[in-house]
Amino acid sequence: MISWTGSNKPIEKIGLVGCGRMGRCMLRSLMDKGFQVVAYDKFPAAVQGAADMGAETAAAPSELAGRTSVILMSLPGPVQLQEVLFGAEGLKEGLTSDHVVIDTSTVDPATTRSNAEGVEETGAAYLDCPILGRPSATGKWMLPTGGNPDALDKVKPALLTFASDAVHVGGHGAGNALKLLNQLMFSCINAISSEVMAICDHVGIDKEVFYNTVAGSSAATVSGLFREVGKSIVNDGYDTPAFTVDLLIKDAKLGLQMAKDADAPSVIAGTVQLYNEIAHAEGLGMQDTSALYKVFSRHYEKLCGQAQAD
């Protein structure tokens, strides 16, 4: 990580690359707090959606970089980041020492460090700033941030339009490392919540009664995720995903590889990933992560059928 000596002039205009679900949440919050936004997305419908919300639009990332010095990215993964940063008419073509590029995507730390190195060749600063929080919790998000702390201080007023805090956690890649650890926890809590709800069906406990009783208690096992997953299972809310099985597989895969590369391979999260992949194989990839309940439910139904046959 190099030192950054960019401008500390007040920020009035923000660039946004990626106008999907999370990007739109950021766009709305920024504009509500008085920031102008210049948006870019490779999909015309997403660009039009941003324009309909009141944003200016850019035809290419390089053009966007010429119109604002603070740029947020919200993209699906490493391939899209590489294209936006270093592809034809990419951001790098328009970056200067006054720019701060903020990546809110969930990617692996190695990708972040490589991207930061390429961006910082221009004198610009690069921050990995993934989001801890659901779209419905916009404004309450936590942003673990890796990179130059001075650059973070400059852009924090913009970040705090959609987050409760942005915390410096280390150098390049540290923000994403923390996010991936969180995603491994998410995967495991989602799985055990789904499994227990499936077991209810076989031990004489109505799963709705179980959910309402536990979620309404002060038991140490109760978490926000259990409340969401359990409620989705009780209400058959699989087709209105807060987070899909396929996205969880992607994030957990990155986290498992990070742990393996650090010679600390995960045992529990690694096992859970097998069930995530079974869910995908059974056609549940675009459903809410609570659809893991269906995997466990079918498993126990088969076991019961075999026991009755014996």
Per-region residue spans from a language model:
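Rossmann-fold dinucleotide-binding core
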Residues: V84, V107-L184
